[in-house]
């Protein structure tokens, strides 16, 4: 088994490492101290990453959008490795800042992972926050108490969330809820 990074990803890995050193690390401590301030420096970086994702050079959460194969082709997972490698490098700079980047964080990852083609198009270029953490159960997805009950074409949400990542700045929020508490994670 070859555990070396593929040569075709070297440039991407190098670029992500440069972002970690030259963009994320220099502002990391500043936003640790001012944790409720919005890191405006990330807007330019997010635009750059958006452009790379559009060009097929996936670098983060939005990279998987539009990169799925047909049923005949099977799932195209090549973008997953490039995304993982770039995220590893950028976490060297600051993981929290990386997850705070517009359109690249946890909510967008959830959309990229499970949305159908219509939903992918609907939420393209949308900054999505993620609401998973609940009082008394933390972020344990199997323990989620918030429910989503189908009501015609809609779902009625009932529950409480805390610590919504990027919730005050995002355009949309992905809410983790269960459709059947007895089924645990498989009903989310």
Annotated model-derived regions:
Residues 105-114:
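Helix-loop "lid/cap" segments that line or gate small-molecule binding pockets
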Residues 125-134:
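A short, Trp-centered hydrophobic/proline-enriched beta-strand micro-motif
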Residues 134-140, 155:
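Hydrophobic, small-residue-rich alpha-helical packing segments that form membrane-like cores
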């Amino acid at each position: 088994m070859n555990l070396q990074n593929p040569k075709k990803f070297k440039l991407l890995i190098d670029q992500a490492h440069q972002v970690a050193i030259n963009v994320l690390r220099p502002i990391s401590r500043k936003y640790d101290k001012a944790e409720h301030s919005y890191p405006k420096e990330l807007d330019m970086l997010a635009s750059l990453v958006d452009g790379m994702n559009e060009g097929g050079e996936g670098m983060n959460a939005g990279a998987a959008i539009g990169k799925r194969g047909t049923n005949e082709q099977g799932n195209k997972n090549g973008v997953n490795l490039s995304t993982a490698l770039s995220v590893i490098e950028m976490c060297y700079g600051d993981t929290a800042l990386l997850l705070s980047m517009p359109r690249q964080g946890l909510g967008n990852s959830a959309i990229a992972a499970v949305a159908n083609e219509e939903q992918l198009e609907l939420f393209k270029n949308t900054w999505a926050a993620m609401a998973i953490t609940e009082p008394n159960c933390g972020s344990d997805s199997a323990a989620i108490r918030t429910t989503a009950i189908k009501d015609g074409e809609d779902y009625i949400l009932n529950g409480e969330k805390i610590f919504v990542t990027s919730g005050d700045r995002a355009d949309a929020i992905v809410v983790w809820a269960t459709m059947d508490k007895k089924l645990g994670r498989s009903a989310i």
